Amino acid sequence: SKLEDVAKALKDQGYKAILVEGHTDSRGRAKKNEELSFQRADSVRSYLVSRGITAEKIKATGIGPSRPVATNDTAEGRANNRRVELVVTPE
């Protein structure tokens, strides 16, 4: 899986800190999107920790719909906006 590959690369290359950012599309209520984006990020964080990433060095945060990478006017754009991004601070 992609996340398995990410975990392996992080362990191989090292890291000082990792921020897992969850994102949503703009549909639905703002509060629900914030919660969903955090749940999405926290799920990835938990998986990476289960694969050997140091829990104290990885944090999850929910961004909600505030930073889209595509339009929210199409199904494809909304799908692209429902994502998780990793911000890695190297050692």
What is the role of each PLM region?
Residues K8-E91:
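Periplasmic OmpA-like peptidoglycan-binding domain that tethers envelope proteins to the cell wall
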